[in-house]
Design a protein with these regions (language model features):
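Single-stranded nucleic acid-binding surfaces, predominantly the OB-fold ssDNA-binding core
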Residues: 1-99
Length: 99
């Protein structure tokens, strides 16, 4: 199963683009910060991740306020067929009420 849920905030956004079939694609960079316990040791986790949303989800991503924590759900895929870089493909999102 390839499913990812991440609480993050949008820190960069690109203009919406359209596929040849007319599907809107929104691209952004997400930032995530948290503290987790691994093997009994507290660990700070900070990361930025490229993300895209297609179709109806692109409109929702465009309306997300920059810097506001949001719960994103989706999957990971290669940026392109021959790339090693992963991109988070967002399919759902909901505000968490935290910022």
């Amino acid at each position: 199963m390839n499913r990812l849920q991440l609480t993050a905030s949008v820190v960069e956004r690109e203009p919406v683009r359209y596929t040849p079939a007319g599907v809107p694609i929104a691209s952004c960079t997400l930032q995530h910060r948290t503290e987790v316990v691994e093997a009994g040791i507290r660990r700070q986790v900070e990361l930025t991740m490229p993300a895209v949303a297609a179709g109806e989800a692109s409109g929702k991503l465009e309306s997300c306020e920059m810097g506001v924590e949001t719960l994103f759900t989706g999957f990971l895929a290669k940026k392109s067929r021959n790339a090693r870089t992963l991109v988070f493909h967002i399919t759902e999102m909901q505000g968490t009420g935290k910022d």
